[in-house]
A protein has these predicted regions:
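The catalytic "switch" region of P-loop NTPases
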Residues: 1-20, 24-28, 64, 171-174, ...
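Walker A/P-loop-proximal flanking segment of P-loop NTPase domains
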Residues: 1-91, 432-458
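Short hydrophobic/aromatic beta-strand immediately N-terminal to the Walker A/P-loop
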Residues: 43-47, 103, 202
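Conserved AAA+ ATPase small/helical "lid" subdomain
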Residues: 83, 135-155, 264-341
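Alpha-helical lid/collar subdomain of P-loop NTPases
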Residues: 316-400
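Charge-biased C-terminal accessory regions appended to nucleic-acid-, cytoskeletal NTPase
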Residues: 378-458
């Protein structure tokens, strides 16, 4: 079974950017230009729901920054391909100096007592790797200074503050401890201007960290790092981050204003271009199951991670049937199964993923609202609506025909599948489809990917 949910590996970041899978390349370009425009140490928060693709967005920005910096370690072929995917102004293309980047996964370092330690370590290690090898002496001094800072900030030296107060010259010792800020300032100044005129530090997953870690990291960054050449970009879910802050300070605490101390600007993560995404997932066709799947993604406002998981499950569950000649059936019971596979199964998978209580009510015959919502879009439901009609039925006023509304028809189909034992207690013919007391079980098994319809090789 293929996992469509990609990790932000170097290869995946490069391929998704070059193919513009999420449709955000233009947003990446504008964000890059925004970063270039700042002439002070700004902190920007990119706000997005969990699973919306924030990590991929910041990695795409980092990729473009590296491509635009001629002193980065990107090979020329990759650099040219990346730049060709965005329409850069000529004035920006010709700049000789640019930005260098650091990526810090806060959640991976969540167990650190002093967040600034792991942050300084990541800055030192990543910048030493990303800057070209001819700056050998500078690298050594840079890393040595980073080591000195880490030593000064370590728990051992912090505990030594107590010993300092007991020494013969306590003020001199405290003065040495407070030189950390100067050393950190020197640390960033050692990045030669011909290599990069700015350092952009991307901090990801902060909203998933323990409250104490989150607070300490924000406070320590503000306290220790104040250099006009250093910028911070936080990719977070602001709502979740505010909840984290309130867990530390209390529910009555104004977490929104507190975060304003650290974030100069807040930006909402641009939405994905779903058309590009559906093409990538193989859902861009006019097969009815693809239309239904796209519609369901829109109805439940699925984020990138939710869509990849959902679409992968639908493909595995039904594509062997829906995208082959097997779907051309002549017997009513077969037509009923094909209808279930194309419509009911994708809906069951979505409900189970998104809302367990709605799923339970739906399969237990208590709530047909999800089916009604699915067909509230008139354009996409006309064809299937006709499929349900008997010879004597019509969706319009016609002589010798019985008019039946869409809602009435959908209710009949829903009851035939999920309330068959209560409403009918026998086989039911609706249009060209036949449903019986085993249709519900068939639908649930298909949605669980545990029938012959499933294809685990997809």
């Amino acid at each position: 079974m293929r996992n469509f949910e990609m990790l932000p590996t170097e290869e995946n970041v490069f391929s998704t950017f070059c193919n513009n899978v999420l449709g955000r390349n233009e947003d990446v370009k504008y964000f890059y230009e925004m970063l270039m425009s700042y002439d002070f140490s700004a902190s920007i928060a990119i706000d997005g729901r969990w699973g919306s693709g924030k990590t991929f967005f910041v990695h795409h920005v980092m990729l473009l920054i590296d491509a635009m910096n001629s002193n980065s370690n990107l090979d020329s072929e990759k650099r040219d391909k990346i730049i060709s995917k965005v329409r850069m102004d000529d004035s920006i293309k010709t700049e000789l100096t640019s930005m260098c980047v650091v990526y810090y996964d806060a959640w991976k370092n969540d167990n650190d007592n002093e967040p600034i330690l792991s942050l300084i370590y990541e800055i030192a290690s990543q910048l030493c790797i990303s800057i070209n090898s001819d700056w050998i002496d500078g690298k050594k001094k840079f890393c040595n200074l980073a080591g000195t800072i880490l030593e000064c900030l370590s728990k051992k030296n912090i505990n030594n503050m107590i010993e300092c107060l007991k020494s013969e010259n306590p003020f001199e010792e405290i003065k040495k401890q407070r030189s950390i800020e100067n050393r950190i300032s020197e640390f960033f100044k050692m990045i030669p201007e011909e290599r990069a005129n700015k350092v952009v530090i991307f901090i990801d997953e902060l909203d998933r960290c323990k409250p104490i870690f989150t607070i300490r990291l924000l406070e320590q960054i503000k306290h220790y790092i104040n250099d006009d050449r250093v910028m911070f970009v936080f990719s977070v879910n602001i709502d979740e981050l505010q909840h984290t802050i309130k867990k530390y300070y209390g529910n009555g605490f104004d977490a929104c204003r507190y975060l304003d101390r650290f974030f100069f600007q807040r930006i909402s993560l641009p939405p994905t271009n779903k058309t590009e995404f559906y093409e990538y997932m193989g859902l861009g066709s006019r097969y009815y199951v693809d239309i239904v799947t796209r519609r369901i993604c829109d109805i439940y406002n699925m984020q990138y991670r939710e869509m990849t998981r959902y679409c992968s499950q639908v493909r595995t569950a039904v594509y062997k049937i829906t995208h082959s000649d097997v779907s051309r059936c002549i017997f009513p019971v077969e037509k009923g199964h094909i209808l279930v596979i194309n419509i009911i199964v994708p809906l069951l998978i979505a409900l189970r993923n998104m809302d367990t209580s709605k799923y339970n009510n739906f399969v237990n015959g208590k709530d047909y609202e999800p089916l009604m919502t699915l067909f509230s879009d008139e354009d996409n439901c006309l064809e299937i609506f006709r499929y349900f009609l008997n010879d004597k039925d019509s969706s319009e006023e016609k002589e010798d025909k019985i008019k039946i509304t869409k809602d009435e028809m959908l209710m009949k189909v829903y009851n035939a599948i999920f309330n068959n034992d209560k409403e009918y207690k026998s086989d039911v013919m609706i249009g060209g489809c036949e449903f019986d007391n085993k249709t519900k079980e068939f639908a649930i098994r298909c949605s669980n990917m545990m029938t012959s319809s499933a294809d685990y090789s997809i």
